[in-house]
Amino acid sequence: LYSSAASDVYKRQVLSSFDAARDLERFYPGHRCAVEVVHFVSYIEPEVCAITPELEQSVRDKFDLKRNYIYIPNQFWQHKNHIVMVEAIECLLKEGRLCDYDFVFTGNLKDYRNPEYIDKLRKIMESDTVCANIKLLGFVERTEQLAIMKNAQFIVQPSLCEGWGTVLEDAKVLDKVVLLSNIPVHQEQQNKKCVLFDPHDPKQLAETIARTAARASLPEHEAEYAGDIEQGIANMYREAREYSRALERVFL
């Protein structure tokens, strides 16, 4: 998306992370533009306020979400790295762990650029070992997606590459625990409810999932894993004010 002539055309580049700024310096060391990093914020208060108990029940019924579940919300593009997640699930279930959990995926199980990768994913997901514990919901409506996220035990985000992840920003507003791949942008974006893992190590991820699920099941940690949405929205407004001030510095 960034041409070699961009620095001759634009005097200023606005990027979503310091990690992206480092990439700019790495790939275009001769650029002459001023770089501004502005972290965007998910403004989802209207959608969150639309999540009523009735909607939550309808989502549970529609998608048959009767058991505790872990949510993986990304599209199935190869850089989103679902392979480490499904291999971790396979590892857990082969060892007889978390057999009473579901692993919920949204997004379309297609990637025209990497059909062999999708075939590899599908082979594991449809195997006898894991198929009973995996739910592929496809594309879901935005408010339904947030309701699914809200009621998950926790979220897993295994990406190998992100700009500034919307999934994590949404999870922050819902005040959810998120297991994050330890890529630089996630280290920059994480908050205190994030747990980092090596995105190339399914066994480490399996252990992190099992440990997090065990903690989530304890009564003394119930509130932590349910999330404090009121606090999440307050944090969203605080970060939105910082975002607005940053944009003012750039454009005014």
Task: Show which residues each predicted segment covers.
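C-terminal alpha-helical cap of glycosyltransferases
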Residues: 210, 233-252
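Short alpha-helical donor nucleotide-sugar binding micro-motif in glycosyltransferases
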Residues: 147-152
